[in-house]
Amino acid sequence: MKYIDEFRDGEVAKGLAEAIRREANPARSYHFMEFCGGHTHAISRYGVSDLLPANVKMIHGPGCPVCVLPIGRVDQAIRLALEQGVTLCTYGDCLRVPASDALSLMKAKARGGDIRMVYSSADAVTLAQKNPDKQVVFFAIGFETTTPPTAVAIKQAAALGLKNFSVLCCHVLTPSAISSILESPEVRQWGTVPLDGFIGPAHVSTIIGSRPYEFFAEEYRKPVVIAGFEPLDVMQAIKMLIRQVNEGRAEVENEFSRAVDRDGNLKAQQLVAEVFEMRKNFEWRGLNILPYSALRIRSHFAEFDAEKRFPLGYASVPDHKACECGAILRGVKRPQDCKIFGTVCTPENPVGSCMVSSEGACAAHYTYGRYKDVA
């Protein structure tokens, strides 16, 4: 298949692996963070780490939207379904995220909550149209990739004059998060590993372009290479990062030029800016409260804001004591460093959110890498 098969070619991968080995200076080590969960999945699925020299290490980042969703936000969604009696719609990955009191949206559904999996925000709008006597709430999560469809849904609901549709907005921002990771006193206090550069996300960058990464590449002297999700994309990005480090450069380079340019999708950006504005603070699982790292619905569309329509409130809830999900999201620990990984915590019985989503570091390692821990 065009744009897939050629980026999974084994012979080319061998050549790239050799090129990376030649490029890497054996006298030093390299630590690169793949921010996006899609890259984490690709690295695990295709065994990219096994093709790298021993001194080139990949660190999992917090770029999995389900993984960074704090328990308190899931609790809000559950309360909407069980206490307010709304029809709650959300993406499939959200259904099994552990919440307070051993609950999840799936378990809340078993208790009688009207909770439905949808494939897009448009499905929730259609449901509200067909059920005018029911309050329908769309639990909106994700980075910049899924934000424009939510904006479209809100504008569509406004155009249709729907009074029974609202959105619980938990959309978060990639560049703000990376900057906050690099400068946050809480993160420094927790002690993250040293980072030599980032593999920038693919789908997010199709929306925002490469321009937003330039600030922290210049400000923090960390090179960034935006890469696609195929194994050869990732390997080429690693080679480009190693070369930047060796040459003392800290620039934003674009390996994924077949889909990403510097400016991104301007129409989508304008749409998001029309419907949403920055939140002053937002809690991320594992990263505490990060300033200006998430979006909320503008006052012009306040009638579609579930946080204003329903008496929700927000309470921060700590993670399970045995769960290392927070440390894994910060890049401090690996999935195999968690005592309950693969025993108490499995994809069938997730204790932490990193085991829930297919983009989560723990789920990826459980599926593709745990056999190496025993070998």
Regions found by a protein language model. Give the residues of each.
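Metallocofactor- and cofactor-centric catalytic cores in central/energy metabolism, strongly enriched
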Residues: M1-D133, T147, A157-L160, S166-L168, ...
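A generic structural motif
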Residues: M58-P65, F165-L173, V225-L232, E255-R258
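Glycine-rich, mobile lid/loop segments that gate access to catalytic sites or pores
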Residues: T145, A151
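Short, conserved secondary-structure transition motifs
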Residues: C170-S179, G264-A268
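A conserved active-site cap/scaffold subdomain adjacent to cofactor or substrate pockets
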Residues: R188-D261
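Internal helical hairpin/lid segments
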Residues: M235-A327
